[in-house]
């Protein structure tokens, strides 16, 4: 090999540096079409939260929030300016926007603001009963709000005192507070001098500092509990079953606007309670929206924030959009092609962000080919598409690409990563034969366009020989019930439940009970050796239970976030599989929709795609919900939902930013520039250089995206981020590294393929002019013609190079190493 080609002369670098420095992008004018009607109903200008009130016991109360929506969509809290009128003043009263009980019965509270009015029904029970303080319902929430359970929840506690992390063990916490060191932490004779109070109020030295005031409602509740003898709760005490935060969405102005929210818990006995003062509040973006201890939001700079409230085992949140006060904004007349654009635009209008325009035809074609098939269009395909005047040509091209085998290859690769299809060090952990059968089965299912929920159902319920029924390899590649439970939740729901194995999830709804209930579906999976050493028989053993770490009690199977099904005499996996594939499962459709969106848009609506949780909210919840509903409506037809996404204007926008969306990277106002994944990049290099690769177990010329085994790789693939499938993950490793840069510049892959393919020799044999050869190379690599400026710079190079083949070789090398080739844009 002539190694000079691996390092093009400095003149080439000087001439071409400006050409290849960035990614070429372009924009077309916005189409002036009428905007479709919004999918969601316009919100009421005047709203009162909550819409109904239920009060139980003498000390119960419910705060009201009154919200006005101005013409520009900004929300105002007008609670303090509103008038409250109780229909029957003997039943209830309102003080500073808080409804208080007086007598049993029912009445209404009329809320009036200017010419607006709304009536809130109120129901009161046991108004004369002073309910005793509950350890679980009143005291533990105080510990949680003050974050006692965070510091003292460490494995060894803190300063000699230990609580359960995030309150997963109420019984143990009560013991440690009241009886572990008798008389040390509580003083029943003089409750105010109890250590749990003096340390929290700053009256005694405390590593955690002062947590609340001595005369606060929290202190008074603790004193009442101690005065009653610090009792534990009865076994049948009501427990929280859900939590809501109101309002669920806010658009506020910056800086300094305030808005108070309210939080309400519902309990297993049917009651509800205002827990705003007991909830722990958090914000995802303090620079845009700060949150006070009792739910007071104060805006900062422009941006988005997700304000969360945690109470008991539940965490809920509200989306807060903050825009500059007095911002002048006019929404342009732009085309909305489907529900995707309508919902993207709704969010952008709230943010006062204008979407970028459409990309040009060359950019669209290249983007669609890479995303849908993992290939590049040929030069002839580019020229034909650009010359086509059919207004429906983009939609038709998408349909053609969806019917190509390469579309199946891409999704077989992604699902192989989710299912961790890989060989192990021995036959017990996945033989090559089993892995190949597993991959081929998966690819066959996708090629037949079998509904995704049915594929999931067949995998979860798989039994028999892993060689005769390849889906049974789902239980061969992973045998630990704990890992099976975690991997299933992550692969099919996009939920990471790992935290809940040892303690209640700090920032999501999942408890240790939820974790063990989900795990119980996998504790009765039996395995035995088949006749072939590589064969394993998967069956229902009928024995094996999931036990709670606290108390070692058996936890029956329970759907995540759902009911406890009847599994008596049934294969538990079949029960789970039926539920996963059913409309009652709220997770699968949204997760698959998010996977699709992330692949084609470069970022998930929930990002990372396999980390769905309250504290990592969707950037556009309405869009995610609509995509999930469409997927169910389409019977989990993968092609149909991909078609919806790719036909949207949102997918076809340019990557070029405007003044309003320059800093936005999560609301899809412009296309995302992203590097090709490792397998696709290698395949595209081979395609444009007309060379063939040989991968283990595949014929020469097979593409890297077709490799079945996660353990099969090359130096190039490993360097550019090919996954080994050791963990559940479909996120593509596309971050730059020094090894990648060095391999492209000095490695043998690009240089060797240029020499091996003979493209330059072929082009020069056709009596083409230098400009025609350069244009052909550009069409191959960038899928566009070179600009006049680029041609002038190239002429400066080949004009001073004695050997034209060497000049073309160097230009080809530079194109393949350019960002515009390596990135999809």
Residues covered by each model-derived region:
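Catalytic cores of secreted or luminal carbohydrate-active enzymes
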Residues: 212-231, 738, 742-746, 750, ...
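Bacterial N-terminal signal peptides
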Residues: 19-34
């Amino acid at each position: 090999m002539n190694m000079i080609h691996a390092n093009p002369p400095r003149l080439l670098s000087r001439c071409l540096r400006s050409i290849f420095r960035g990614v070429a992008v372009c924009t077309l004018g916005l189409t002036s079409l009428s905007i479709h009607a919004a999918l969601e109903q316009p919100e009421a200008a005047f709203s009162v939260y909550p819409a109904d009130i239920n009060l139980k016991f003498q000390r119960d109360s419910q705060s009201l929030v009154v919200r006005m929506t101005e013409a520009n969509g900004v929300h105002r809290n007008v609670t303090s300016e509103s008038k409250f009128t109780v229909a029957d003043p003997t039943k209830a009263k309102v003080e500073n926007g808080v409804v208080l009980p007086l007598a049993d019965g029912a009445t209404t509270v009329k809320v009036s603001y200017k010419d607006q009015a709304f009536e809130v029904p109120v129901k009161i029970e046991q108004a004369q009963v002073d309910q005793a303080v509950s350890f679980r319902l009143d005291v533990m929430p105080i510990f949680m709000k003050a974050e006692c359970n965070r510091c003292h929840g460490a494995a060894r506690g803190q300063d000699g005192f230990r609580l359960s992390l995030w309150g997963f063990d109420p019984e143990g916490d009560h013991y440690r507070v009241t009886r572990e060191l008798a008389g040390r932490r509580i003083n029943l004779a003089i409750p105010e001098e109890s250590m749990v109070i003096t340390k929290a109020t700053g009256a005694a030295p405390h590593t955690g500092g002062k947590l609340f005031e001595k005369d606060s409602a929290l202190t008074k509740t603790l004193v009442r509990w101690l005065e009653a003898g610090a009792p534990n709760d009865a076994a049948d005490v009501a427990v929280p079953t859900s939590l809501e935060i109101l309002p669920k969405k806010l658009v506020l102005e910056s800086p300094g606007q305030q808005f108070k929210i309210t939080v309400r818990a519902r309990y297993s006995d049917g009651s509800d309670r205002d827990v705003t003062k007991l909830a722990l509040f958090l914000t995802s973006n303090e620079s845009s929206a700060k949150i006070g201890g009792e739910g007071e939001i104060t805006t900062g700079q422009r941006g988005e924030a997700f304000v969360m409230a945690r109470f008991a085992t539940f965490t809920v949140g509200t989306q807060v959009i903050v825009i500059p006060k007095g911002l002048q904004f006019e929404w342009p007349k732009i085309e909305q092609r489907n529900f995707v654009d309508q919902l993207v635009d709704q969010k952008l209008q709230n943010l006062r962000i204008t979407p970028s325009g459409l990309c040009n035809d060359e950019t669209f074609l290249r983007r669609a080919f890479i995303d849908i098939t993992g290939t590049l269009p040929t030069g002839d395909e580019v020229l034909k598409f650009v010359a086509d005047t059919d207004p429906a040509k983009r939609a038709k091209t998408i349909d053609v690409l969806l019917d190509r085998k390469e579309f199946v290859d891409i999704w077989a690769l992604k699902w192989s990563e989710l299912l961790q299809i890989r060989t192990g060090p021995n036959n017990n952990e996945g033989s090559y034969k089993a892995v190949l059968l597993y991959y081929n089965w998966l690819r066959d299912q996708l090629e037949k366009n079998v509904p995704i929920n049915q594929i999931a159902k067949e995998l979860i319920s798989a039994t028999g020989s892993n060689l005769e029924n390849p889906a049974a390899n789902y239980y061969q590649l992973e045998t630990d019930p704990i890992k099976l439970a975690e991997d299933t939740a992550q692969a099919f729901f996009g939920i990471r439940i790992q935290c809940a194995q040892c303690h209640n999830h700090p920032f999501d709804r999942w408890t240790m009970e939820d974790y063990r209930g989900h795990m119980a579906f996998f504790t009765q999976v039996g395995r035995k050796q088949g006749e072939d050493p590589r064969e394993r028989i998967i069956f229902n053993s009928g024995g094996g239970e999931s036990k709670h770490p606290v108390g070692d009690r058996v936890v029956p199977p329970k759907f995540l976030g759902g009911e406890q099904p009847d599994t008596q005499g049934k294969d538990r996996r079949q029960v789970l599989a039926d539920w996963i594939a059913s409309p009652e499962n709220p997770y699968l459709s949204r997760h698959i929709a998010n996977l699709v969106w992330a692949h084609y848009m470069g970022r998930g609506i929930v990002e990372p795609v396999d980390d769905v949780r309250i504290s990592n909210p969707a950037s556009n919840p309405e869009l995610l919900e609509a995509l999930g509903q469409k997927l169910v409506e389409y019977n989990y037809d993968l092609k149909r939902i991909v078609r919806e996404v790719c036909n949207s204007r949102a997918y076809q926008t340019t990557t070029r930013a405007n003044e309003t969306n320059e800093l936005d990277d999560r609301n899809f106002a412009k296309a995302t520039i992203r590097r090709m994944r490792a397998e696709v990049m290698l395949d595209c290099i081979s395609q444009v250089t007309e060379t063939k690769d040989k991968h283990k177990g595949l014929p020469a010329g097979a593409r890297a995206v077709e490799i079945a085994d996660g353990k099969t790789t090359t130096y190039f693939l490993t360097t550019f981020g090919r996954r080994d499938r050791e963990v559940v993950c479909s996120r593509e490793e596309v971050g730059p590294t020094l090894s990648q840069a060095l391999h492209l510049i000095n490695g043998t892959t690009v240089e060797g393929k240029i020499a091996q393919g003979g493209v330059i020799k072929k082009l020069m044999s056709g009596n083409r002019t230098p400009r025609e050869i350069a244009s052909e190379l550009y069409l191959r690599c960038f899928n566009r013609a070179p600009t006049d400026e680029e041609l002038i710079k190239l002429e400066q190079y080949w004009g001073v190079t004695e050997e034209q083949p060497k000049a073309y070789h160097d230009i080809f090398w530079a194109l393949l190493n350019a960002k515009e080739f390596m990135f999809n844009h």
